[in-house]
């Protein structure tokens, strides 16, 4: 099906372009969301008459997204979750959790604007991409930790999954030569 795009859509085209898409994509997403019109003579003339208002609305949305992006730029958000000794979370941090965290800080972001291919399942520093507008994209850092104190240590660059961080033991002291006597022949019954 040929459609006229009413806004820029990633991997599809710019506003005003006539593109060919699958029927289901057009019927189930583009047309109901108001992102496109069927490409026929009546809709082409309708689009040309409304083009100025659509471009103005697009510029307004883009400027709003840029102000939010400037406010979010360089920010790090702490996520406290329970986790095992190895840093594996008992659960995960998904896109809806990212939306809740940003909402608590006063940023109104939709779940569809968060690009998180797989949920976060380990503690550590994770970068999450936000698509605020088709032309405005940024990354925020999530500091996933077991406590606020651990998040602070982690933000300074300390690894919380090492043996020292978990058990308070120096990893260098856990070398095999410390456990075995290289001089012994292996027979303990020589008495």
From Swiss-Prot:
GO annotation (BP), single: translation
- Which GO cellular component terms are attached? ribonucleoprotein complex; ribosome
Q: Which SUPFAM superfamilies match?
A: L9 N-domain-like (SSF55658), Ribosomal protein L9 C-domain (SSF55653)
Q: Which family does it belong to?
A: Belongs to the bacterial ribosomal protein bL9 family.
* Protein's name according to its UniProt entry: Large ribosomal subunit protein bL9
InterPro entries associated with the record = Ribosomal_bL9, Ribosomal_bL9/RNase_H1_N, Ribosomal_bL9_bac/chp, Ribosomal_bL9_C, Ribosomal_bL9_C_sf, Ribosomal_bL9_N, Ribosomal_bL9_N_sf
- Chain residue ranges for the region called Disordered: 149-191
State the coiled-coil residue ranges: none
The record's function comment reads:
Binds to the 23S rRNA.
Entry's Gene Ontology molecular function annotations: rRNA binding; structural constituent of ribosome
The residue ranges flagged as biased composition, category Acidic residues, are: 179-191
Keyword set, alphabetical order: Ribonucleoprotein, Ribosomal protein, RNA-binding, rRNA-binding
